[in-house]
Amino acid sequence: MAIHFFQGKEDYLTTHHANDDNKIEIIKNKISEFFNMKNVHFLFGSGTSCPAIPNMKGLFEKVEEKIKTESNIQEDNKNLFNTISKKKNNNIEEILGVLYSKREFLKGIIEPEDSEKYKECNKLIHFIEKIIFDEINISFTENANTVVLDIYKSFYQKIALRNKDLSRINIFTTNNDLFNEQALDALNIHYINGFNGGLNKYFNPAMFNYTYSKRMDTTIDRFEPVENMVYLYKIHGSINWIEDTSSNNNYFGIKEEYKPFYDETKSTLIYPTPMKQNKSLGSPYSDLFREFQHKLLEPNSVLFVIGYSFSDEHVNDIIYRALATNSTFNLVIINNIGEDKPICKINDNRIFKVWEDDNNEPIHYFKQIVNKLLPNLDAFKQKDILAEFIKQIKE
């Protein structure tokens, strides 16, 4: 099948006289050039965690099927779900947004304890949330899931270590799962995700201004950045984040749990919609989106977009703003998002698009990107030695 690589509206492969034998090499060389830029960012969408976790379409289908067969959901609410689904094009986040709005409306005009409508609406919301939670809260020891986890590990093995004179890599993700954390922990790669503390970890966006450094000289205060480190921004929340105001030290009211669990009495932060009691406009979402915007406006930046379909207008607006105000910002979309998306209609030489017309394992799949397109940074020349040592000592 055909591999495509466009710069703006221009076919990059044609202008560089590519043939079937060197197409991938030409794309890889260009991507390698971007890694020499001062600031390298990645944006992950649901495609990076497939098939271990369903994408948004898959989540909707699972919710729809279970609502149809659930006897505890009233027919009126089943019909309400179907009506909202049609109006919101089966987008599960937007469906939840409407239901959150209805719940707040009912809560505002009547006493919740006396309202059957409020109880039923709340029941439907919790039912949907629990399905989503269960689909995301997977076991990382199951074969299908370990395959995806290994891809994440390979990704971080390739990109985590950078020259100390360059900025650390930033990973922004709309995913709520724990694949990033699992991979980083398995590889002993340091990461900052906005939480600080020991046994109890609380959200503090100031952490994104910190870095890990090591002392270079025991006699004087001389430090240099730790190379194997990344910043992780979960801009749509995480399965292991909950609201918690029990501690006086938790100024932002968000706690990171070691093991994810679902509790109807606590709000798990994996459903950010504009109508969810304005939470997506407040902390932690406002802080995370602000960081996203700030990073894209830094000079000499590149954003690699993987597995994201440009379906979140808030995220899209920040990308558009970076293109409009930062002349040194480059955007590399490695996904077949379709020509109907507004971003694909822009003729700008700072926008690159890579995809393949293949129904099996096209070049824009996460596995193929990691194995065939991403450069293997020189700093990782010791990774095989270390991996072999760890393997042998365990045996």
Task: Report each predicted region and the residues it spans.
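A short acidic (Asp/Glu
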Residues: P51-K57, N180-D185, T245-S246, E313-I319, ...
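A short alpha->loop->secondary-structure connector
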Residues: K62-S71, L187-N200, G307
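Cofactor-binding loop segments of dinucleotide-utilizing enzymes, especially the Rossmann-like FAD-
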Residues: S46, T174, G237, Y308, ...
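SIR2/sirtuin-family catalytic core signature
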Residues: M1-F42, R222, N278-S280, P284-S286, ...
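Short secondary-structure boundary/capping segments
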Residues: N55-V63, D185-N193, N250, I319-R321, ...
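Acidic, metal/cofactor-coordinating or nucleic-acid-engaging core segments within structured domains
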Residues: D244, N248-E298
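Extended, H/D-rich, highly charged conserved domains that either
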Residues: T83-E116, N122, R162-S267
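Gly/serine-rich nucleotide phosphate-binding loop at the start of the catalytic core
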Residues: M1-L184
